[in-house]
Amino acid sequence: MTAQKWPALRVESGQATAVKDNVVVEEAIKLYLNDELVTELVATPTNLEELGVGFVVDEALAKDIQSVRSSSGVVAVYARSARKRPWKLQSSGGMGTLSDLPKVSSNITLTPDNVLSVIRETTSELWTRTGAVHCSVLFLEDELLVKRDDIGRHNTIDKVVGFAILNEIDLSRCIIGCTGRQPAGMVYKVANAGVPVIVSKAAPTYNGILTATDTGITLICFARGDRFTVYANPQRIRNLSGEAAIGPLTCASP
């Protein structure tokens, strides 16, 4: 169950009306890797096996996933080899440090129309009902593969990556579209998955931009209507016009 009806009092211009509102449901999820507790997450209780697999890969805990199962608020992931590192919860919802950034290599390119097509898919039915969830989508080049929503923006990334891994999809040919802001921890997740492009409706942070630049990810934010802003690695965007479309990103001195 992702939402429940709840009695509430809606007030407009001082006039009160009794309503039954759709309210999103969340649950505490315990995630185990090779029978060892890794973390506890608060998540929308759907697609939990994808969430577990995606989290393990996106946090660089393991890549060679053997199996996954979920039951009663517990997700158990099994991998042939798992890294053991001192983990620290990040404010972005990620874990670990950003000291060993991966490099993302891909020949994928996209047009402005591709970018806007991606972001148009990030409105979900659950968000329309509750207004309380984030959404991420996964495109294989220009084909929409999957859409996942969750109360946590980081969980939506883990879910679409988990879907790709469980379905043996080449993530180096993929684009992730999402609704959440992009701090370093979010970009780090996508880099560990090997996805070369992030398209977001929301803002980046300074460290998010630095992380995208260093990992080789094309970071596109404020994608709304017919516009967007490219903050890192714009070489993957083709069919651009204007003088600024030529050459690397530069910034005038303040």
Q: Where on the chain are the PLM-derived regions?
A:
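Short, intrinsically disordered/low-complexity patches at protein termini
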Residues: A62-D64, I169-L171, E243-A244
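Active-site/ligand-binding-proximal alpha/beta "capping" segment
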Residues: T250-P254
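Intrinsically disordered, low-complexity regions enriched in acidic/Ser/Thr/Pro/Gln residues
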Residues: M1-L140, V146-K147
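Feature captures the catalytic cores and cofactor-binding loops of soluble hydro-lyases/lyases
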Residues: H154-V230, R236-N239
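A charged, well-structured terminal subsegment
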Residues: P234-L249
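Short alpha-helix boundary/capping segments
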Residues: A43, R148-G152, P204
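Histidine/lysine/aspartate-rich catalytic loop segments that bind and position anionic ligands
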Residues: S124-I169, I175-I176
